[in-house]
């Protein structure tokens, strides 16, 4: 909630977020009394402890899982040499799309044919559309929505670099989806993201189009090196975020909770 408020200076947006998160008052009362909480990242665990005043010993971290067969590289699928891909809901400042767009403008000088694919919607006459016009990027950005998982996989397979420029992520599915599809990844070094990427992505500071620009350029100019990192990144995702591992962790904690409940004195 507080990260969304910090991400935008617009009063109207802040009011809408305040109304949306009004249920948090109830959660703050209930959460400290819950004996077992499961959350998908260490970062979100810290947030629950700090914001909801919960006992850290009552909180278990179990990552979200991913079907790594659905999100996988496609053999003999040609990559567009200078295509970038990102996932962002337009006009949601927390996703940091502005900084990717500003970096794209800078990159056009060195890579005139560069193109950005955004998986998400664009709001008619909204902030993002206005920024694209201001930067003269109308022909260089394409928004795609209502896609199947296979279509998303094809977009990753046909792109050369993925960017996650979020200002906050409680988990961050676009991170592990991109890594599972074996595409070089640039991601912000915030909240849960570095937990997911380990050493298999180029981490940058948030709100920094200069770092996005430099990172994309570096990957373009030494692609074989970074595609090898991406291959190791997929192995990392398969090992740590496969559904068999995740369901076993859930089974273990649920069984433990049931056992503690049966042994409790009421």
Question: Can you describe what each PLM-predicted range is?
Answer:
Residues 43, 65:
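Carbohydrate-associated surface elements
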Residues 167:
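Aromatic "clamp/platform" in nucleotide-sugar-dependent glycosyltransferases that forms part
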Residues 77-95, 101-104:
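Conserved donor-binding/catalytic core segment of Leloir-type glycosyltransferases
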Residues 184-187:
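Short hydrophobic beta-strand element within catalytic cores of glycosyltransferases
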Residues 202-209, 218-223:
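Conserved acidic donor-binding segment of nucleotide-sugar-dependent glycosyltransferases
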Residues 146, 154-159:
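Short alpha-helical donor nucleotide-sugar binding micro-motif in glycosyltransferases
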Residues 1-28:
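Acceptor-binding helix/loop patch of EC 2.4 sugar-transfer enzymes
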Residues 128-150:
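Nucleotide-activated donor-binding/catalytic signature segment of Leloir-type glycosyltransferases, i.e.
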């Amino acid at each position: 909630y507080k990260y969304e408020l910090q991400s935008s200076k617009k009063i109207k947006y802040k009011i809408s977020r305040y109304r949306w998160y009004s249920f948090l008052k109830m959660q703050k009362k209930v959460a400290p009394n819950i004996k077992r909480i499961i959350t998908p990242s260490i970062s979100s665990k810290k947030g629950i402890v700090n914001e909801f005043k919960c006992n850290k010993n009552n909180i278990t971290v179990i990552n979200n899982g991913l079907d790594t067969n659905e999100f996988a590289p496609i053999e003999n699928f040609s990559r567009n040499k200078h295509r970038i891909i990102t996932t962002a809901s337009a006009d949601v400042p927390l996703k940091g799309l502005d900084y990717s767009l500003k970096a794209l403008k800078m990159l056009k000088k060195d890579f005139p044919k560069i193109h950005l694919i955004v998986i998400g919607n664009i709001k008619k006459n909204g902030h993002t559309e206005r920024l694209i016009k201001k930067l003269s990027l109308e022909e260089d950005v394409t928004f795609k929505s209502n896609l199947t998982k296979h279509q998303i996989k094809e977009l990753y397979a046909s792109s050369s670099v993925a960017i996650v420029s979020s200002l906050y992520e409680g988990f961050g599915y676009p991170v592990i989806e991109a890594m599972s599809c074996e595409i070089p990844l640039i991601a912000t070094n915030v909240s849960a993201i570095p937990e997911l990427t380990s050493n298999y992505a180029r981490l940058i500071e948030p709100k920094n189009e200069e770092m996005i620009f430099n990172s994309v350029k570096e990957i373009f100019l030494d692609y074989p090196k970074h595609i090898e990192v991406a291959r190791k990144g997929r192995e990392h995702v398969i090992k740590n975020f496969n559904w068999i591992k995740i369901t076993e962790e859930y089974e273990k904690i649920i069984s433990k909770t049931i056992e503690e409940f049966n042994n409790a004195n009421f």
